Design a protein with these regions (language model features):
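A short alpha-helical cap/connector motif
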Residues: 1-133, 138-159, 165-216
């Protein structure tokens, strides 16, 4: 595919996506704070995965990302009204934006859980083997621990989505020894060694990984 064709395709996808007020407000919040957020293609993929997997877990979906408002909006529209969405984010302003977005969609407040903390600090408290989907956009240095914790809470058949985790391919550069690159590199090695996870590495953002936990 040529670069011009690729750019045309992306424009077409964007043109076919008309954000409503809830999504537009969530995107505006992300832009105001300089937060990376999923584009239309990524958001639609997240919604599709959420729709496919939500019946698998009794505890719902975990969103661990600064852009929880944007991600949560895509996910919430794809799952049942009583599906719990747990947003984990240390910044209270981003949490409030996520809560506002989810409640604006008409979701019951009982289905929106906010955990104001670093994901790796609190995910160990979540119920094991009971979540249908875990979406994470975390620092590279935290990825190995995040993957370990996410694997523990996924229900069989559940999906782990790691956004922007391939660092535009720089993890293959042996001269990059900063903590985030080393952590991202270790995370990929961890995933490759898990024989009960089926992986797809996708060129969305700076590199996405979708990992599905095998059914028992």
């Amino acid at each position: 595919m040529s670069e011009p064709a690729s750019a045309s395709l992306l424009r077409y996808i964007d043109d076919q996506t008309s954000p409503d007020d809830v999504l537009a407000n969530a995107v505006e919040h992300a832009q105001e704070f300089g937060i990376a957020y999923p584009d239309a293609s990524t958001g639609q993929l997240l919604a599709t995965l959420a729709a496919l997997t939500y019946p698998l877990g009794s505890s719902g979906v975990v969103v661990a990302a600064n852009a929880a408002a944007v991600i949560g909006t895509y996910v919430a529209r794809a799952v049942a009204e009583d599906t719990r969405i747990s947003c984990i984010e240390p910044d209270i302003e981003h949490q409030q934006a996520a809560q506002k977005a989810l409640l604006s969609l008409g979701r019951p407040s009982s289905t929106v859980r906010l955990m104001t903390a670093q994901p790796v600090q609190v995910m160990g408290r979540l119920a094991k083997s009971s979540y249908s989907m875990v979406i994470g956009d975390v620092a590279g240095k935290d990825l190995p621990r995040f993957i370990e914790l996410a694997r523990n809470i996924l229900a069989p058949g559940g999906v782990l989505v790691l956004l922007d985790c391939l660092l535009d391919g720089t993890i293959t550069d042996p001269t990059r020894t900063d903590r985030d690159t080393v952590g991202a590199r270790e995370a990929q090695e961890m995933l490759a060694a898990m024989d009960d996870m089926f992986l797809a590495r996708l060129p969305f953002g700076s590199g996405m990984v979708v990992a599905t936990l095998a059914h028992e």
